[in-house]
Structures are given as C-alpha cells and as structure tokens.
C-alpha cells in the first residue's frame, strides 16, 4: 500500500500494517450498509402495498455480511489504547467520506479524526497530504450530502420496487437514477420507431476548375429533374458571391471522468465501467491523478509545474518535436471543486509503460494526448463559401484550407489510427464575383431524412450529463443525472438487470432497451422516470455538499414524493400483458411454463421448485455461463454440448451437460464425456 510505504508502516499484520507509530488498514467497499426493511419491522419480510410507504424515522445500519472480519479488525484498531487519533484516508470524494464515517460510527469510536484529501497517489503528494491534514469538520457537509443520497436511493428503491412489483405481480427493480436513464433510451427508441423518412432530391454541379456545388432540396423528383435538364443545357454558372473567413478551433479541455469515458467508448469501444476500472488501476499505480473528477481545469498553483509534466509526457510517448505550452488555457481555479482535471503524473516518465495491460495503456494514452493537445495552439483554417447561379437557381459550395494544424497535429501524432481516416479538405477554385465557370458535370442526388440515432455509451453518458439543461433557468448549475463516479455503475446495473442490452457488430456497441425495459417505463409514473426531477435532486445534493441547503429540507421533499406516489399510483389497465415474463420453455418437472426473471429461469407453478439459476455453481466449475441459449437447449433437449470446459487443473475438454430433476423438483446436472474421456 502506498500510504503504508510513505509512513513507514511496513510490518504486515492480519488486516493491517504497522510501524513508525502508524497503523494502516483499509475498507473493502461499503463495510456498513443501511439495514433492510425487516430490521425495522418483521412484517416487511412480506411485500405488501398496505405496508407502504416505508419511511424510517431513525435509520439503522448493519455490518455487511461479507466484510464482517475486516470491520472487526478496524473496530479493534480504533479502540486500541495506544491509538489517540484517526486519519480518514478513504477515497477523496462523497462516497469515500460516507464509507469512513459509517465505519467510525458503527464502531462506536469517539476519538478525534482528520481528513487526508489527495488528487494523486504519488509519494510526494501523499507526504504533502499527511503534512497538511484537513480538519474533519471541513467535510461535514460532504458527508451530509452522501447520507442524503444514500437514504434517498434506499427510500425510492425500496418503496417503488415493492409498489410496482405488487401492482404487476412480479419483481420489478426501480431506482432513483436507474429508471430515468432507462426512460431516456425508451423515449429515443420510440422516436426512432415513429420516424417516417422523407425523400429529397438535389442537383450537384461539378466545376471544371474543381469543387462541387449543390442546389436546395426538392421534395418532388420532377422539380429536381427539370432543374438538372436546364443546368445541363446552360452549361455555365455565374459567381454571385465568394466569401473567405479565417476561423480557429480552440484546443480541447482536459478530461474529467465522463469526457474520458465518452472518448474511450467512441475511439476504443470500451464501456464506461471498463474505462473507470482501467483509470482506477492507473491511479493506484501512480500513473494518473484522481479519476472520479468532474472538473476539466487546473488550479493556479499548478501552473509552475505543468511545463515539466508536459515535457515528461511528450518524452514518454516519443514526441520528438518541441511542444508548445500555453499553460493559462487549462488554468481556472473557479471551475475546480474537489479535484482538478485528469492528468498523467510525473511518475509516468520512469515507468515501464510497455508492461501495462493494453486497456490501461490505451486509457493512459488518451489522458496523455489530451494534456498535450490542451496546452497546444489553436487549429487555424480558412473557410470558403461559394454561391453561384445556374438556370436561375442558387448553388452553394464550401471549401476549407488549413492554415495551421495547431493542436490537431499532436492529436494525430498521439492517436493516429484511433481517429480513422480523416476527410481531405475541399479546395475551391479561386474565382471572382460575376465571373463564369464551366460546368463539368451535373447529376441528380437522392437522399432521405435521418431518424434520431440509437444511444451508445458515449451519447448516453452525454445525455445523463446534460439532462434537464434545456428546462433549467439560466445561471443555475446543471448537474445532470448521477455523478461522474456513479454513471458507469448505473449503465452496468441496467444491463445486468436485463433492462438494457449492448448490440451491434461494430467496435462501439449500441445501448438498446429490452422489451422488459420498455414495459417497465410504460407503467412508470412521470415523477419516477423524469430526468428533470432526478437532475434537480442532484443539484440539491450539490447544494447540501456546499452547505447551501439543509439536509432535512431535501429528505422532507423525498418523503413527500414517495408518500404521494404510493397514495396515487394504480395498476394501468392492459399493462399486465406488457409485463409478462418471457416464456423460455416447459418445466421438465411439472409441465408448466418456465419464464425468465432477473436471477434465472423459474417454473411459473408456485408449488414447483424447478429453477435454472443464471449464477450457476455447476456451470462455473466448468468455466461456463448458463445463458439463455444454454437454458433453451436444456429445456428443449434435456442436454447441451459444451466445448472447452475447464478442469480443476486447467485442462480443457468437451462434454455434454445432462438435465434431470431431483425428487423435490429441483434441477440436477450431470456430465457425459466424449469418447469415454
């Protein structure tokens, strides 16, 4: 551990390290969690609309069953007589603050604690952080925001999931952030399905001196054909106007997490979660700064060290030409909150980058390229617009001449093959007003209007980030849905629960709602699926974090919304047909239908115990997954042939899995080997 190394705590014990007057231990995710409803009252074990809403007055917490041992170690360490103070060194963000405080409180600790707040895991940054520990009180508002977020998610999830599950007779997972994100994809698919393409026609004229000009669009083909005939007969165009404007494209901003995830999806095909995982690993290897940032700028005190970092980064990626460094382009302390923009670190200069896994190397490459581009010079070009007349109709053409590549040259150097083939700029002939040009060719072009595009991870992240922006007043900070740290997990959860699926043969997959996802949104009331309401809640959580809003005010609003939801929501007529589970086959035990649910394929007969679990231990031992295709084969044929099964010793073999039933109806699997092997 980096902290232990810097502090000199090098003696490894069970669950912690010790030395030089320090004890260094760790949390494993959320060690302490909100208690389930049945802890408040045993009646909540059974789901019933009559028991809703469930709105705890005094919140209760439990130690997570999977992390009890580590919690016990932390509790003992906190209460050791020789420990006089504690340092909260958890992740420098909202969730890290919550994780520590819940452990501290559940452990019954009263000793003073301070806060280590870092944006880099480099040894110098850690030493500096421990030398300037922050008072814990500076982060009380951050903790309050984290508590409100956790409790609001619990109340919406528990109450809405139970309400809609009871109304429609099957388990339905509803979430404060998850459901509005799903709704955005369903609305987009509905718009695509409802879209009626309209054909249009244009006439394109190519000039003898180079370049092509196009007419306006015609709805009727006959009108375009008439113009085409006239143009061919006339054979010349008269130049009405020639405009040349010099323009520039500023360098891109540094990455925050969402911008990095979007580019990694667009250029590399990575999911948001994959990018976050790669970035987290790079951070722990001290090669990049804190990844879960929402800022795209640096603070003023970083200006002096930035040129050295830029030079080191260029050298690490074999950039031989001198790098222009315009530091002030990336400095704006007023736009930095908890953490500055993502950067490579100076440690990268001495690291063996070739030894990195491919995914990590590519993410580091993106972050490094963005730094080198962000401090570069503008991309300058001249845009030419040519307007001509032929057969009394206006034709226009646009051309472009690059004056200075600027930052785009660095982008090509760093990311060349990822960017794909770039369009060659169109150079128009140099002509004078009222002069005439010969028409080398004229042709009819047919096109049609395009529907909205399906969401990819890139565009869905953008939609989450900018949700409600159009409906919020000017001057109000737009927070979007979720945070940079949680958006990836939201998408993954929707996929895992079967509401979204990734489809497509291209590197970057489409994110499409499943029939199950569409059905869920069909029955959801507006307040649960509204991106605007969820984005408004995120803004209020940010205000709590800044001490501008009382937590009690926010929680009262959530309570009121949930109470109203329970009181006013009724099952929609005809919706049960939409909500029916997909039938996969016939139960081999009792003959009833087997339907797919979140965790497996279940017999619809409540008296029957037959189920095929998706997370199946038998198939795991073979190194395989029990997916829909395998389940379908087992139900139809009672057997499925599997290739490349893995033995305990790592050897591979082919085998057939046979399905039968125990006396009580539960599924039983056995293996049949090929050739007696």
Name each model-derived stretch:
Residues 89-92, 169-171, 244-253, 262-268, ...:
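Conserved short loop/turn motifs at secondary-structure junctions
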Residues 221-255, 261:
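Metal- or metallocofactor-binding catalytic centers and their adjacent structured scaffolds
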Residues 78, 106, 161, 194, ...:
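Basic, low-complexity terminal or inter-domain segments flanking catalytic cores
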Residues 1-4, 21-24, 28, 64-75, ...:
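Amphipathic alpha-helical transducer elements in NTP-driven molecular machines
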Residues 59-62, 90, 110-114, 135-142, ...:
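Short, polar/flexible loop-turn hinges at active-site or ligand-entry regions and domain interfaces
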């Amino acid at each position: 551990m980096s902290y232990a190394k810097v502090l000199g705590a090098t003696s490894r014990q069970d669950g912690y390290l010790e030395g030089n007057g320090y004890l260094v231990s760790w949390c494993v995710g959320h060690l302490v969690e909100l208690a389930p409803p049945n802890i408040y009252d045993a009646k909540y074990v059974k789901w019933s609309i009559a028991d809703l809403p469930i709105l705890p007055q005094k919140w209760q917490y439990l130690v997570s069953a999977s992390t009890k041992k580590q919690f016990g170690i932390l509790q003992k360490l906190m209460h050791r007589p020789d420990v006089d103070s504690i340092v909260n060194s958890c992740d420098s963000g909202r969730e890290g603050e919550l994780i520590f405080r819940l452990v501290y409180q559940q452990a019954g600790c009263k000793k003073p604690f301070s806060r280590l707040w870092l944006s880099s895991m480099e040894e110098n940054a850690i030493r500096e952080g421990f030398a300037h520990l922050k008072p814990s009180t500076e982060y009380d508002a951050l903790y309050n925001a984290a508590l409100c977020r956790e409790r609001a998610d619990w109340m919406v999830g528990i109450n809405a999931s139970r309400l809609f599950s009871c109304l429609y007779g099957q388990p339905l997972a509803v979430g404060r952030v998850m459901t509005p994100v799903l709704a955005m994809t369903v609305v987009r698919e509905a718009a695509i399905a409802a879209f009626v393409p309209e054909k249009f026609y244009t006439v394109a004229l190519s000039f003898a001196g180079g370049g092509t000009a196009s007419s306006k669009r015609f709805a009727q083909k006959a009108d375009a054909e008439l113009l085409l005939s006239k143009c061919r007969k006339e054979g010349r165009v008269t130049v009405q106007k020639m405009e040349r404007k010099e323009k520039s494209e500023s360098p891109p901003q540094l990455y925050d997490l969402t911008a990095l995830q979007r580019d990694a999806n667009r250029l590399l095909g990575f999911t948001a979660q994959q990018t976050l995982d790669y970035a987290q690993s790079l951070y722990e290897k001290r090669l990049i700064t804190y990844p879960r940032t929402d800022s795209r700028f640096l603070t003023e005190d970083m200006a002096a060290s930035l040129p050295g970092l830029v030079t080191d980064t260029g050298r690490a990626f074999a950039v031989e030409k001198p790098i222009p460094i315009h530091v002030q382009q990336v400095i704006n302390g007023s736009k930095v909150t908890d953490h500055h923009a993502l950067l490579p670190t100076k440690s990268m200069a001495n690291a063996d980058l070739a030894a990195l896994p491919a995914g990590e190397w590519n993410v580091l490459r993106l972050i490094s390229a963005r730094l080198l581009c962000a401090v570069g010079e503008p991309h300058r070009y001249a845009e030419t617009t040519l307007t001509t007349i032929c057969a009394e109709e206006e034709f226009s053409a646009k051309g472009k001449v690059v004056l200075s590549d600027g930052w785009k040259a660095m982008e090509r150097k760093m990311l060349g093959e990822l960017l794909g083939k770039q369009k060659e700029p169109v150079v128009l002939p140099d002509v004078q007003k009222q002069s005439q040009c010969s028409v080398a060719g004229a042709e009819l072009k047919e096109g049609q209007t395009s529907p909205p595009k399906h969401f990819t991870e890139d565009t869905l992240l953008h939609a989450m980030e900018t949700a409600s922006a159009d409906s919020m007043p000017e001057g109000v900070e737009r927070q979007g849905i979720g945070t940079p740290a949680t958006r990836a997990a939201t998408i993954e959860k929707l996929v895992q629960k079967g509401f979204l699926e990734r489809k497509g043969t291209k590197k970057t997959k489409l994110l499409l709602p499943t029939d199950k996802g569409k059905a869920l949104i069909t029955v959801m009331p507006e307040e649960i699926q509204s991106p605007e309401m969820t984005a408004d809640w995120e803004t209020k959580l940010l205000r709590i974090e800044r001490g501008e809003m009382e937590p009690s005010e926010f929680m009262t609003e959530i309570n009121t919304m949930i109470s109203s939801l329970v009181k006013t929501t009724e099952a929609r007529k005809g919706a049960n047909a939409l909500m029916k589970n997909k039938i996969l086959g016939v139960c081999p035990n009792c003959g009833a239908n087997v339907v797919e649910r979140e965790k497996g394929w279940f017999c619809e007969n409540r008296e029957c115990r037959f189920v095929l679990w998706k997370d199946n231990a038998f198939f795991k031992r073979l190194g395989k997954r029990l997916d829909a295709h395998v389940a379908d084969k087992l139900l139809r044929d009672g057997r499925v042939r599997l290739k490349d099964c893995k033995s305990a010793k790592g050897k591979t073999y082919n085998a057939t899995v046979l399905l039968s039933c125990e006396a009580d109806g539960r599924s039983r699997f056995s293996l049949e080997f090929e050739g007696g092997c």
